Protein backbone atom coordinates (compact mmCIF):
# COMPACT_ATOMS: atom_id res chain seq x y z
CA UNK A 1 0.00 0.00 0.00
CA UNK A 2 0.97 3.66 -0.40
CA UNK A 3 1.35 5.07 3.10
CA UNK A 4 -0.62 8.31 3.38
CA UNK A 5 -0.01 8.93 7.07
CA UNK A 6 -1.81 8.24 10.33
CA UNK A 7 -5.29 9.65 10.90
CA UNK A 8 -7.64 10.22 13.83
CA UNK A 9 -9.47 7.07 12.72
CA UNK A 10 -6.39 5.04 13.66
CA UNK A 11 -6.55 6.37 17.22
CA UNK A 12 -10.29 5.66 17.38
CA UNK A 13 -9.55 2.06 16.40
CA UNK A 14 -7.76 1.74 19.74
CA UNK A 15 -11.04 2.62 21.50
CA UNK A 16 -13.18 -0.09 19.86
CA UNK A 17 -14.76 -2.23 22.61
CA UNK A 18 -14.01 -5.95 22.74
CA UNK A 19 -10.98 -8.02 21.86
CA UNK A 20 -12.22 -9.44 18.56
CA UNK A 21 -13.59 -6.15 17.24
CA UNK A 22 -10.52 -4.12 18.18
CA UNK A 23 -8.13 -6.71 16.76
CA UNK A 24 -10.13 -6.69 13.53
CA UNK A 25 -9.74 -2.91 13.35
CA UNK A 26 -6.02 -3.12 14.10
CA UNK A 27 -5.47 -5.77 11.44
CA UNK A 28 -7.54 -3.94 8.82
CA UNK A 29 -6.64 -0.30 9.40
CA UNK A 30 -3.37 -0.06 11.33
CA UNK A 31 -1.19 -3.05 10.50
CA UNK A 32 -1.04 -2.31 6.74
CA UNK A 33 0.31 1.14 7.67
CA UNK A 34 2.78 -0.45 10.08
CA UNK A 35 3.96 -2.75 7.29
CA UNK A 36 4.50 0.17 4.90
CA UNK A 37 6.16 2.42 7.49
CA UNK A 38 8.15 -0.42 8.97
CA UNK A 39 9.62 -1.53 5.66
CA UNK A 40 10.87 2.00 4.95
CA UNK A 41 12.30 2.51 8.42
CA UNK A 42 13.88 -0.94 8.51
CA UNK A 43 15.70 -0.16 5.26
CA UNK A 44 16.73 3.22 6.67
CA UNK A 45 18.08 1.76 9.91
CA UNK A 46 19.89 -1.08 8.15
CA UNK A 47 21.76 1.48 6.05
CA UNK A 48 22.45 3.79 8.99
CA UNK A 49 23.68 1.03 11.28
CA UNK A 50 25.49 -1.08 8.70
CA UNK A 51 23.67 -4.10 10.11
CA UNK A 52 20.64 -5.90 8.71
CA UNK A 53 17.52 -5.04 10.69
CA UNK A 54 14.21 -6.89 10.70
CA UNK A 55 10.59 -5.78 10.98
CA UNK A 56 8.23 -7.32 13.54
CA UNK A 57 4.55 -6.41 13.94
CA UNK A 58 2.86 -7.07 17.28
CA UNK A 59 0.26 -9.82 16.98
CA UNK A 60 -1.12 -9.75 20.54
CA UNK A 61 -1.52 -13.54 20.50
CA UNK A 62 -1.53 -13.83 24.28
CA UNK A 63 -4.71 -11.77 24.49
CA UNK A 64 -7.77 -13.86 25.29
CA UNK A 65 -10.19 -11.42 26.97
CA UNK A 66 -9.08 -7.79 27.08
CA UNK A 67 -8.25 -5.87 23.89
CA UNK A 68 -4.73 -4.41 23.59
CA UNK A 69 -4.40 -0.83 24.86
CA UNK A 70 -1.61 -0.21 22.37
CA UNK A 71 -0.23 -1.76 19.21
CA UNK A 72 3.14 -1.34 17.51
CA UNK A 73 5.78 -2.38 15.05
CA UNK A 74 9.30 -3.20 16.21
CA UNK A 75 12.60 -3.10 14.34
CA UNK A 76 15.46 -5.23 15.64
CA UNK A 77 18.68 -6.91 14.52
CA UNK A 78 17.26 -10.35 15.42
CA UNK A 79 14.95 -11.89 12.82
CA UNK A 80 13.47 -14.35 15.32
CA UNK A 81 12.34 -11.90 17.98
CA UNK A 82 12.84 -8.45 19.42
CA UNK A 83 11.68 -8.40 23.03
CA UNK A 84 14.94 -9.39 24.71
CA UNK A 85 16.99 -6.96 22.62
CA UNK A 86 17.19 -3.17 22.30
CA UNK A 87 14.75 -2.30 19.51
CA UNK A 88 12.90 0.57 17.89
CA UNK A 89 9.11 0.87 18.06
CA UNK A 90 6.44 2.88 16.27
CA UNK A 91 2.99 2.43 17.73
CA UNK A 92 -0.30 3.79 18.97
CA UNK A 93 -2.26 4.24 22.14
CA UNK A 94 -5.70 5.80 21.73
CA UNK A 95 -4.34 9.25 22.60
CA UNK A 96 -0.86 9.40 21.10
CA UNK A 97 1.54 7.83 18.62
CA UNK A 98 5.01 6.90 19.86
CA UNK A 99 8.44 6.40 18.35
CA UNK A 100 10.61 4.67 20.94
CA UNK A 101 13.97 3.11 21.45
CA UNK A 102 12.70 0.37 23.74
CA UNK A 103 14.28 -1.75 26.45
CA UNK A 104 11.45 -3.86 27.84
CA UNK A 105 11.39 -6.28 30.76
CA UNK A 106 12.58 -9.29 28.76
CA UNK A 107 15.91 -7.53 28.14
CA UNK A 108 18.68 -9.55 29.77
CA UNK A 109 21.21 -6.68 29.83
CA UNK A 110 19.14 -4.19 31.82
CA UNK A 111 21.72 -3.62 34.55
CA UNK A 112 24.56 -3.05 32.11
CA UNK A 113 22.52 -0.74 29.87
CA UNK A 114 21.06 1.29 32.75
CA UNK A 115 24.46 1.75 34.36
CA UNK A 116 25.97 2.90 31.07
CA UNK A 117 23.22 5.48 30.58
CA UNK A 118 23.52 6.65 34.20
CA UNK A 119 27.28 7.00 33.85
CA UNK A 120 27.41 8.52 30.37
CA UNK A 121 24.90 11.28 31.07
CA UNK A 122 25.68 13.18 27.87
CA UNK A 123 24.02 10.44 25.78
CA UNK A 124 20.62 11.42 27.13
CA UNK A 125 21.38 15.06 27.97
CA UNK A 126 21.88 15.76 24.26
CA UNK A 127 18.36 14.65 23.33
CA UNK A 128 15.90 17.39 22.27
CA UNK A 129 13.55 18.84 24.90
CA UNK A 130 10.62 17.51 22.86
CA UNK A 131 11.61 13.91 23.65
CA UNK A 132 9.95 11.75 26.30
CA UNK A 133 10.60 8.65 28.40
CA UNK A 134 8.37 5.87 29.68
CA UNK A 135 8.96 3.34 32.48
CA UNK A 136 6.43 0.82 31.13
CA UNK A 137 5.40 0.02 27.55
CA UNK A 138 1.96 -1.12 28.73
CA UNK A 139 1.10 2.20 30.40
CA UNK A 140 0.24 5.51 28.73
CA UNK A 141 2.10 7.66 31.27
CA UNK A 142 5.20 9.39 29.89
CA UNK A 143 7.57 12.09 31.15
CA UNK A 144 9.54 14.78 29.33
CA UNK A 145 13.09 13.46 29.03
CA UNK A 146 14.57 16.41 30.94
CA UNK A 147 11.98 16.91 33.72
CA UNK A 148 13.84 15.09 36.51
CA UNK A 149 12.36 11.58 36.15
CA UNK A 150 15.21 10.20 34.06
CA UNK A 151 17.50 9.01 36.87
CA UNK A 152 14.68 7.30 38.79
CA UNK A 153 13.38 5.63 35.63
CA UNK A 154 16.83 4.27 34.76
CA UNK A 155 17.38 3.05 38.33
CA UNK A 156 14.03 1.27 38.26
CA UNK A 157 14.95 -0.31 34.91
CA UNK A 158 18.20 -1.51 36.50
CA UNK A 159 16.88 -2.69 39.87
CA UNK A 160 13.32 -3.95 39.29
CA UNK A 161 12.79 -7.26 37.50
CA UNK A 162 9.92 -5.89 35.41
CA UNK A 163 11.58 -2.50 34.97
CA UNK A 164 11.62 -0.97 31.50
CA UNK A 165 13.05 2.08 29.77
CA UNK A 166 11.64 3.63 26.62
CA UNK A 167 12.91 6.88 25.13
CA UNK A 168 11.79 8.78 22.06
CA UNK A 169 8.98 11.07 21.01
CA UNK A 170 5.18 11.07 21.22
CA UNK A 171 2.61 12.73 18.96
CA UNK A 172 -0.99 13.71 19.72
CA UNK A 173 -3.66 12.73 17.16
CA UNK A 174 -3.80 16.22 15.62
CA UNK A 175 -0.02 16.58 15.21
CA UNK A 176 0.88 17.80 11.73
CA UNK A 177 3.81 15.37 11.49
CA UNK A 178 1.48 12.36 11.25
CA UNK A 179 0.44 13.02 7.64
CA UNK A 180 1.00 12.99 4.74
CA UNK A 181 3.01 9.80 4.76
CA UNK A 182 6.24 11.28 3.42
CA UNK A 183 6.24 13.88 6.20
CA UNK A 184 5.82 11.21 8.87
CA UNK A 185 8.63 9.09 7.41
CA UNK A 186 10.92 12.13 7.38
CA UNK A 187 10.02 12.94 10.99
CA UNK A 188 10.51 9.34 12.10
CA UNK A 189 13.94 9.23 10.47
CA UNK A 190 14.94 12.40 12.33
CA UNK A 191 13.85 10.85 15.64
CA UNK A 192 15.71 7.62 14.88
CA UNK A 193 18.85 9.63 14.10
CA UNK A 194 18.71 11.10 17.62
CA UNK A 195 18.23 7.63 19.14
CA UNK A 196 20.93 5.76 17.21
CA UNK A 197 23.79 6.84 19.53
CA UNK A 198 21.84 5.42 22.49
CA UNK A 199 21.12 2.23 20.58
CA UNK A 200 24.79 1.78 19.72
CA UNK A 201 25.84 2.47 23.32
CA UNK A 202 23.38 -0.13 24.62
CA UNK A 203 25.03 -2.83 22.51
CA UNK A 204 28.57 -2.14 23.71
Curated annotation (Swiss-Prot):
Entries under InterPro entries matching the protein: UPF0637, UPF0637_domain_sf
Protein name in UniProt: UPF0637 protein LMHCC_1566
Family classification: Belongs to the UPF0637 family.
SUPFAM superfamilies linked: YktB/PF0168-like
Highest taxon, organism lineage: Bacteria
